[in-house]
């Protein structure tokens, strides 16, 4: 399965790519709630978010993905608020335990799978500093999410 997570207007995405039976598109429908940091997904019902807003099954979806594509406006070298919220709500994909990877502390993975991670940042005048911050963040995301391989692209416009 391929998951496309984006913050584009729906019409713009429809004009750019075709959905298939093997793809799932996650877009900002204004219904997502912020992670409460309650750790229900780790302690009470492992792998499942307590907030029932349609985004409570992200960990399960990630576990079935072969490829995750993120299309996000670049905000100071990071994701847009919607994309950041999706990634925050994906924490049930990980376990509440830690291990050392590359001399850094990271969560252990819940699912013994990996996927390809393709990230497209768009925006006018993305600075070199913002690009470096974004690259560093994506590399850390990839370690945390047990990503097999990844690509990062920076685009002036996403048409």
Name these PLM-found stretches.
Residues 54-57, 103-107:
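A generic local structural motif
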Residues 1-68, 74-95, 143, 154:
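N-terminal beta1-alpha1-beta2 submodule of the flavodoxin-like/Rossmannoid cofactor-binding fold
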Residues 70-72, 94-98, 102, 121-123:
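Glycine-rich anion-binding loop/nest that anchors nucleotide
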Residues 108-115:
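Short, conserved loop/helix-junction motifs that constitute active-site signature segments
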Residues 1, 125-159:
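Glycine-rich phosphate/pyrophosphate-binding loop and the adjoining helix
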């Amino acid at each position: 399965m391929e998951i496309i997570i984006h913050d584009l207007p729906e019409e713009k995405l429809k004009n750019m790519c075709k959905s298939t039976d093997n793809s799932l598109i996650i877009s900002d429908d204004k219904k997502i709630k912020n992670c409460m940091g309650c750790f229900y997904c780790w302690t009470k019902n492992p792998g499942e978010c307590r907030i029932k807003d349609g985004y409570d099954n992200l960990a399960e979806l990630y576990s079935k993905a072969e490829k995750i594509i993120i299309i996000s406006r670049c905000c100071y070298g990071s994701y847009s608020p919607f994309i950041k919220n999706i990634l925050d709500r994906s924490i049930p994909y990980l376990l509440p335990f830690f291990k050392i990877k590359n001399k850094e502390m990271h969560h252990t993975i819940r699912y013994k799978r990996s996927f390809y991670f393709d990230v497209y940042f768009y925006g006018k005048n993305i600075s070199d500093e913002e690009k470096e911050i974004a690259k560093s963040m994506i590399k850390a995301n990839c370690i945390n999410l047990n990503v097999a391989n990844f690509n990062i692209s920076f685009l002036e416009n996403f048409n």
